[in-house]
């Protein structure tokens, strides 16, 4: 999965409902997608998860020198869904609601 346009959780929810044992591979280059990956890891039951960061350099010739120039890093996250019998998005919503009710603010005050 790549180029999710900020809808990664929605895409994965549909895939999980179709096959809760599916193998997933997600490519990420933007900080926004990398942040979404953290939410994915916290939301969906999974096994065999692996996260890689790959860096590639291209060699450019400058006069008599060959200089490596770094390209942007690519993150690759792979995992297999694990079936639990419940919808992971429902569990995530409940967790967010509970966090909103009991979240600690400055000096321990409750935030809503």
Model-assigned labels for residue ranges:
Residues 1-3:
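Helical hairpin unit composed of two closely spaced alpha helices linked by a short loop
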Residues 5, 55, 83:
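A broadly conserved detector of short glycine/acidic/proline-rich loop/turn motifs that flank catalytic sites
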Residues 5-6, 31:
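Short, surface-exposed acidic/glycine-rich loop or hinge patches that mediate macromolecular interfaces
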Residues 6-14:
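A short, conserved alpha-helix within the catalytic core of class I
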Residues 14-70:
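C-terminal substrate-binding/active-site "lid" region of AdoMet-derived donor-dependent transferases
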Residues 65-96, 109-112:
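Core SAM-dependent methyltransferase catalytic element
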């Amino acid at each position: 999965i790549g180029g999710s346009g900020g809808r990664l959780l929605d895409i994965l929810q549909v895939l999980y409902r179709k096959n809760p044992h599916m193998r997933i591979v997600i490519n990420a280059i933007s900080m926004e997608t990398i942040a979404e990956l953290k939410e994915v890891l916290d939301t969906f039951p999974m096994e065999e998860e692996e996260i890689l960061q790959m860096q590639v350099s291209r060699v450019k010739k400058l006069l008599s020198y060959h200089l490596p120039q770094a390209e942007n890093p690519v993150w690759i996250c792979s995992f297999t869904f694990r079936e639990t019998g419940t919808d992971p998005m429902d569990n995530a919503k409940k967790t967010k609601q509970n966090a909103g009710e009991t979240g600690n603010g400055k000096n321990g005050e409750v935030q809503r």
